Amino acid sequence: MQAYFDQLDRVRYEGPKTTNPLAFRHYNPDELVLGKRMEDHLRFAACYWHTFCWNGADMFGVGAFDRPWQQPGEALMLAKRKADVAFEFFHKLNVPFYCFHDVDVSPEGASLKEYKNNFAEMVDVLAAKQEQSGVKLLWGTANCFTNPRYGAGAATNPDPEVFSWAATQVVTAMEATKRLGGENYVLWGGREGYETLLNTDLRQEREQLGRFMQMVVEHKHKIGFQGTLLIEPKPQEPTKHQYDYDAATVYGFLKQFGLEKEIKLNIEANHATLAGHSFHHEIATAIALGLFGSVDANRGDAQLGWDTDQFPNSVEENALVMYEILKAGGFTTGGLNFDAKVRRQSTDKYDLFYGHIGAMDTMALALKVAARMIEDGELDKRVAQRYSGWNSELGQQILKGQMSLSDLAKYAQDHNLSPVHQSGHQELLESLVNHYLFDK
């Protein structure tokens, strides 16, 4: 079959001085960073949905892209054509992983029977493509938000029949993920929230969502799926308020239903922006709570109130993110999935490459800066100094539960305590980070 991206062999590393827009300037898969290959640190993935399913439509305009697999025709044939182009893209971009929703890769059909038959046929196609290309599945998931049946949610829907349909999709998608060697399975509650409290029973919906997640965990163990289950937090859009608002909110939810040891988090940069947080904050929070799993690498626009899903281009922002990830030991089953799309006006098919190449170079530079921060150790040293008092006898007695509140009150009085505030040196630390970023 004729190549779709016929003007490109494969994207390769050419170094920082290259002027070739279809080459990497900073991402060298085999370069060692802290003793580990760059590819193994970053674990890049390209997503199926934005890259091959979006037709360029928005709230104010119809599809702007001319994609052969999006033209009228027999649905399964077009899905197979899309898979051909997708794996050509993954191979030529030189990414080790990809991600999908069930209906990204397969026609949904008019019934559950059609859905399952179509998906089974396309999973065979994907398995063959993976074997041929060497590209692996980072994670799979089920789209339980696009079809009109999910207008009031999937797991939180007031109709248990909709809940059951969603369960069928998750069962099918998780089993497909297992068969394809997927390393994670993601749960994103696109419509698990509310538009108005006037018709919403918050306690009922929370109980439904908790039971659904418990059943997902049960099914994972039943089928022997060895990957990681991930929830992807988002505060709103398409609903007014979503129950998986941010990392801290999801932690509280998981604790309530006894799932904090079973499910981790897939953190998206743009969702952090929508929640009023920095990307750095959400990553650091997930790590502090023991829930860090994977990353959807993109960026939002702080001046806009919706999910713009742009490609990451800030080394400053992502260096701090990679610093937290490296300190925590790096990715295990997770990776950096580019949940990002070209702009509607970017109608050249090679714009897909320009967006991903720039993003991969950005994350490679961020990794190198983070490695310098780790190797130098100054930032870590200053944080340790700031909290060093907690290593004292008093600090340890407090943390180990050996002193009560009244014991502490007596201690303060007996020792005539008069502590003096110590500078946090924020400006110094910000300058230190700039040193890592910009000084050679």
Curated annotation (Swiss-Prot):
This is Xylose isomerase. The lineage of its organism: Bacteria, Pseudomonadati, Pseudomonadota, Gammaproteobacteria, Enterobacterales. The keyword Amino-acid biosynthesis does not apply. It is found in: Cytoplasm. Homotetramer. The gene is xylA. It comes from the Bacteria. Its main location: cytoplasm. PANTHER family: PTHR48408, XYLOSE ISOMERASE. GO terms for molecular function: magnesium ion binding; xylose isomerase activity. Keywords: Carbohydrate metabolism, Cytoplasm, Isomerase, Magnesium, Metal-binding, Xylose metabolism. It is an enzyme of class 5 (isomerase). Mg(2+) 2 binds at residues 268, 271, 307, 309. Mg(2+) 1 binds at residues 232, 268, 296, 339. One of its GO terms (cellular component) is cytoplasm. It catalyses: alpha-D-xylose = alpha-D-xylulofuranose. One of its GO terms (biological process) is D-xylose metabolic process.
